[in-house]
Amino acid sequence: MKQIFSTLLVVGLFSGSAYAMGPTKKYEACMKQTGNVLSEIDACMSKEYKVQKKRLEKVFKPYLAKAPAEEQGLVKQSHQQWLAQRDQICNNKPIVKNEKTELQRISCLMQMTQTRADMYEARTGRISK
């Protein structure tokens, strides 16, 4: 029984990561060129967030289409609730607003959006390019 569980766990880990697109190559290159300058890091993250946001919209469509017709309303509702939760978590008002808190906000939005898009891709078996 333990061996079956271990096998399923390993298969689950690899199957999820097999489809995960993660950050774009442009983002990785951009971040390497920032020289740890906060304004440049912010610019890279903002661009990547826009890319991941579009990607999320793109991969949600086949994910929704794959759901049974009677469950599509719930899938849409769940997606909208997730968007609201992401925005609430990432856009909380800091006591002091500065470059670092803005970086935290955009990093949160970017990473949560990328992770959700990765999940939709893994569940549909499609990889967006």
Positions of the model-derived regions?
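Sec-dependent N-terminal signal peptides
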Residues: 4-15
